[in-house]
Amino acid sequence: MKIFQKLLVPVALLACGVAYAQFPSVLKLVKSVVIPDSNIVFSVSNKAPKTDAEWAAVLKSAEKLVAGAQQLMPMGPDTGREPWVQFTQSLGASARKAAAAAKARNADAVVAAGDEMFEVCEGCHRM
């Protein structure tokens, strides 16, 4: 299931190509930050970090996702903004949980935050 998540996010993005084509900066941010950094958070479910460097990488990715969620918020559609704003806020909240868990070196909490993040991403792509 967890490996499936790594593959599903990019596939879901491709399925939303029409919506993202309207917002090229959204697509750029998703491809450059959201996908690679969420994959690092998701990877903890397959292999928990052990070294300082591995934990630092998870923390850095979670922090980049927090910033990315803040950058995404104003980029959404002009109409029907409420769901967009809710999803970007939820993405930021789950990324903050992942960052806190990485700081505490709590792999189970990182996985839980990653699962929450995955659900947020899925919900947004169903919009």
PLM regions: where:
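Bacterial N-terminal signal peptides that target proteins for export
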Residues: 1-11
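A generic structural signal for short, solvent-exposed coil/turn residues
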Residues: 13-15, 33
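Sec/Tat signal peptide C-region and signal peptidase I cleavage site
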Residues: 16-21
